[in-house]
Structures are given as structure tokens and as C-alpha cells.
């Protein structure tokens, strides 16, 4: 099965030929060609969510928006119905009070951040995966670090139905590999960074190739099942899938 983290990039008119309306067809073609079982989308707004749902009826979407009013920008995890069944899920805020909508850390930017937990049954194997889709703060390293610590704490507190041996933590972490913000994950012996060999994920629509800020961490127990990890670098006539390269993990 294939699991993808995909920062969609909000629908900004200022992106010109790379505005979402021009990228949507390329995104559709790529997903139809690759047929990933799971796609963890970040930077989803209501308009782009509506387009995705219309283009991809083969997928079930679970997620939510990040503000106190449950609007604006958010995260959604798409599950291919042929391969998976959504058993449950939860939206929680990366903050000292995860169940208060719109809450955030004191060190954070003005934007709240959410985590999307999905409990996913893989039909072919019968196993249940716990997938955490994240988009961390873009201004404060400390807030990003606390967001990851909050996610690890969530896994520990919900061990009754979150199996750490079948857990994946992925998304746009907004920090580079040398950042101390990653310490909550790197200090966990049961986790490893499956994207360690990837050097670039954020490319600003082809303008740079020196920033890796998107990650897929997963349980050490699953390491031997990883057959490939690669960015999707598709481009057509100057149009990219996003300003980030989506990253695809293949599991047996």
C-alpha cells in the first residue's frame, strides 16, 4: 500500500499558473495513476476540499478546520475505499488544551494547529493503522516542538486503541532535519524517520531545492516493510502538484 503526505498549498490567486485551479487536474491525474491508499492533505480550505471530493469519489475524507469557528484552513486525510475502512478518528488541537477548538501554545503564531488522527483498517492485510496528520507552526520552533510532543502524548494516553507498533506521524512539520523541534520524535526509540534520505520537499514551485520540511515517521516495527520512499516531483509546462513535493511511502 502507498501512504502519502501532501501539502496542497492554499488556493492563492497570486500563484499564477500554479494557482490551485490550474493544479487540480494534475493532482487528480497523479492520484489516479498512483492509487495511494492514504493521502494526508495539509493546507486544505473549503473550496479545495469540495474540488477534491468531486474529483476523488473513490476516497473518503476525514479531518477538520483549525479555528474556533471550525473554518479557514485545515487538514484532511483521504482513504481509498477499495483498500481501507475508516474505523474512527479525532481532531485535536496542538496546544495545552487539545479539546478546546482554536487553542494554541503561547509561543505560537496567530494560527491554531490541529492534528488529525485516523484509525484505518487495511482490507488486504486486516491490520489497523493509526495515522496522525500534522501541520506544525511555521514561525516558532518551540511551538512546533510542543506540537510533536503533544502528538506523542496523545499516543501514550490512548494506548487502549492506538497501537504504537502500527502508528505513523506524518505531514508538514515546517522545520528542517537539524531542528531541535524534531526531538520529541527522535527521542522515541520506537519511531524512525522514513524520509531520512530525502533532501528536498519544499521547492516554492521550482524556485528552490534546499528545504526538507515534510516527513513520515513510523514505528520501528514496520521498518522492514518499507519498500520505497520518494517525493512526487511531477511538473507539466511549469505547473507543479504543489509548492511542496508530496512524499509517498510504500509498504508491503
Predicted features along the sequence, with ranges:
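Generic structural signal for small/hydrophobic residues in well-ordered secondary structure
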Residues: 7, 27, 78, 118, ...
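Metal-dependent phosphoester-hydrolase catalytic domains
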Residues: 156-167, 174-252
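Surface-exposed cleft-lining segments at the edges of enzyme active sites
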Residues: 12-16, 94-107, 134-144
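N-terminal, active-site-proximal structural segment of metallo-dependent hydrolase catalytic domains
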Residues: 1-55, 66-73, 129, 148-149
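Active-site environment of divalent metal-dependent phosphoester hydrolases
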Residues: 11-13, 44-50, 70, 138-142, ...
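His/acidic metal-ligating clusters that form di-metal
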Residues: 114-123, 128-132, 144-170, 182
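Active-site metal-binding loops of divalent metal-dependent hydrolases
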Residues: 7-8, 134-136, 172-173, 245
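Structured beta-strand-rich core segments of catalytic domains in phosphoester-bond hydrolases
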Residues: 38-128, 230-231
Amino acid at each position: 500500500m502507498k501512504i502519502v503526505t501532501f501539502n496542497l498549498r492554499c488556493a492563492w490567486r497570486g500563484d499564477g499558473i500554479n494557482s490551485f485551479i490550474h493544479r487540480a487536474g494534475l493532482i487528480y491525474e497523479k492520484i489516479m495513476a498512483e492509487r495511494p491508499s492514504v493521502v494526508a492533505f495539509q493546507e486544505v480550505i473549503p473550496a479545495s476540499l469540495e474540488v477534491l471530493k468531486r474529483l476523488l469519489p473513490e476516497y473518503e475524507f476525514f479531518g477538520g478546520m483549525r479555528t474556533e469557528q471550525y473554518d479557514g484552513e485545515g487538514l484532511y486525510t483521504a482513504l481509498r475505499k477499495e483498500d481501507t475502512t475508516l474505523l474512527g478518528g479525532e481532531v485535536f488541537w496542538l496546544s495545552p488544551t487539545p479539546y478546546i477548538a482554536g487553542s494554541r501554545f503561547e509561543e505560537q503564531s496567530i494560527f491554531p494547529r490541529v492534528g488529525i488522527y485516523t484509525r484505518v483498517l487495511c482490507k488486504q492485510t486486516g491490520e489497523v493503522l493509526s495515522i496522525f496528520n500534522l501541520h506544525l507552526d511555521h514561525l516558532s520552533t518551540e511551538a512546533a516542538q510542543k506540537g510533536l510532543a503533544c502528538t506523542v502524548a496523545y499516543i501514550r494516553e490512548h494506548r487502549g486503541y492506538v497501537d504504537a507498533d502500527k502508528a505513523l506521524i506524518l505531514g508538514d512539520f515546517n522545520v528542517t532535519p537539524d531542528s531541535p523541534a524534531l526531538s520529541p520524535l527522535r527521542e522515541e526509540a520506537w519511531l524512525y524517520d522514513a524520509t531520512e534520505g530525502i533532501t528536498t520537499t519544499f521547492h516554492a514551485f521550482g524556485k528552490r531545492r534546499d528545504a526538507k520540511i515534510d516527513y513520515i515517521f513510523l514505528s520501528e516495527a514496520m521498518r522492514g516493510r518499507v519498500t520505497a520512499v520518494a517525493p512526487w516531483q511531477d511538473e507539466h509546462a511549469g505547473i507543479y502538484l504543489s509548492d511542496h513535493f508530496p512524499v509517498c511511502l510504500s509498504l508491503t
